Amino acid sequence: MTDRWVCLDVGETLIDETRIWSLWADELGVPRLTFLAALGAVIARGGEHRDVFPIFGADDWRQRLLAVERAYGGFTDADLYPDAHRAFAGLRQRGYRLAIVANQPEARAEQLRALGFDAEVMAMSDGMGVSKPDSAFFDQALGLMGSPEPAAVAYVGDRVDNDVLPSIAAGMRAVWLRRGPWGVIQRLPESARPALVVESLDELVERIGEAW
């Protein structure tokens, strides 16, 4: 049988991003709840994360990235969703080949490896030179996996716009993980048919076979 791959997103898939968004609120001097509510409103109207900053007059947010990154210090065990390691091990035990390919700074790949995620393929958008939802991101991801048939790859992510729709367009099996701000706020277009919709990575492990 042809090898099947499970390719995982990072933010709100393996990593709970509450800490990084809370640090942004602190940097801007905004109550955390207020900042997170504004982020949710931006998502609900179809905006990008960067659209939250002008709400608080922070047009200079790019100049503040370094300060926030210093405070964040990269991924830690405390940032992992509780099911992340279980799912990684469970998918491997079921014979799936594993990749992690996501929109992230390049340094995140080494941080994930340090946390025990030894995926066969690990690539971040900054190092790839292209980001989701660009189709070239998914083409490059397939190339890094050795160019399997797209239908042999399940791409797992929380965002409809960045993960589900473009992975369907690439011919992959789209798996929508409904958690995190984007996962619970965004809605699927009526025409979109992901291969699988799950609420957790534990559910993913139990139901991944249904993606095919």
Q: What residue ranges belong to the model's regions?
A:
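N-terminal helical cap/lid subdomain that shapes the substrate entry/recognition surface
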Residues: 1-96, 106-109, 118, 124
